[in-house]
């Protein structure tokens, strides 16, 4: 954290903490982090940056480090791509990242564990971007419960 004091503002529905590096938005009225971030951006009249990374490429540890670096660099939300063995809707860069992640042992369960560990270090909104197939294989109810 920077030497700047944490300045807290809000409208009674959320708490925005400005550390000088990133504005952390957490909900106080049941809104999720994603809704709260977009609400904050609308009120400020600003644009948001949604960064993307394929989870597990090249490792879970590297993914966590990159997520935290993207947050420090100003990302408002971060999409974590869940690698899939047949990523036909993705371009070649994401296809190759998915293949590397899978070759390194990335799994949906491992990625959900990564998200839980990241939650201990950051409150930035995280979105999982995936194909239906890995979720179906994991089990729809189990995936929803674990996510």
Question: Model-predicted segments: where are they?
Answer:
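Active-site-adjacent beta->alpha loops and helix N-cap segments on the catalytic face
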Residues: 30-35, 86-92, 106-114, 135-141
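N-terminal amphipathic alpha-helix/helix-capping segment at the start of soluble metabolic enzymes
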Residues: 2-4, 11, 27-50
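Alpha-helix-loop-beta-strand connector modules within alpha/beta enzyme cores
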Residues: 93-127
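Glycine-rich, proline-tolerant flexible connector loops at the mouths of alpha/beta enzymes
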Residues: 57-60, 77-107, 134
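Active-site mouth loops of central-metabolism enzymes
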Residues: 49-62, 127-140
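Conserved, mostly hydrophobic/aromatic
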Residues: 51, 81, 147
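Non-catalytic positions within long, well-ordered alpha-helices that form the structural scaffold/packing
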Residues: 68-71, 144
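Short, well-ordered coil/turn segments that N-cap beta-strands
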Residues: 44-49, 74-76, 122-126
């Amino acid at each position: 954290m920077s030497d700047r004091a944490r300045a807290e503002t809000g409208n009674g529905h959320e708490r925005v903490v400005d550390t000088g590096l990133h504005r952390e938005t957490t909900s106080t009225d049941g809104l999720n982090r994603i809704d709260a971030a977009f609400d904050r951006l609308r009120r400020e009249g600003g644009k948001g940056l949604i960064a993307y990374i394929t989870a597990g490429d090249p490792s879970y540890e590297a993914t966590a480090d990159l997520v935290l670096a993207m947050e420090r660099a100003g990302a408002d939300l971060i999409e974590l791509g869940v690698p899939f063995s047949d990523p036909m809707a993705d371009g070649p860069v994401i296809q190759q990242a998915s293949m590397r992640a899978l070759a390194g042992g990335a799994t949906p369960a491992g990625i959900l564990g990564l998200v839980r560990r990241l939650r201990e270090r950051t409150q930035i909104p995280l979105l999982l971007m995936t194909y239906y197939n890995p979720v179906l294989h994991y089990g729809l109810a189990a995936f929803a419960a674990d996510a």
